[in-house]
Amino acid sequence: MHAILGASEACIATHPSDMCVALAALDAKVHVTGPTGERTLAFADFHRLPGNTPQRDTNLQPNEIVTAVELPPQGFASNYTYLKIRDRLSYAFALVSIAAALELEGDRIKEVRLALGGVAHKPWRDTAAEAALRGQTATQAAFTNAAELLLRDAKGYEHNSFKIELARLGIVRALSQAARGTPQSQSRKNIA
């Protein structure tokens, strides 16, 4: 199913990985080595949008290889979820997936990470939506506002416009689950 964010005239394919969505949400770093030495990329900068060169999925330079992926320590141990919405329970790419992690102080959001899969050519993060949640009370209204902000530039095509509303509902659900500390079970699928 095609992209609703970050697409170009040359490519509307979506990135299929679940792990990359989680790594994007956790602010992972990618260590690479090549002919000019070693360098480190923020995971958000590792994958690229298609633009006019959709054959290039990453920002690796010629002859570079990934040597390590680093996960920084975070306080998301009990307030996280990964929600994967797909056509069937097994062997299916996500129509929409959401990695959500919250650090709460009481019912206030101190820190938040939110990444989407199945919606763009790369794992999708919008730091403006995350910033809008910081300091807010963890409520459905706050989560709905963040979803609206994150999807403000979403563009559906005839066959996939439903993904915008699916993503909106999924974001609210994932953030609500993370706030409650109840990760989504992959054996049951509740959206509303």
Feature locations, PLM:
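C-terminal structural segment of proteins
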Residues: 1-192
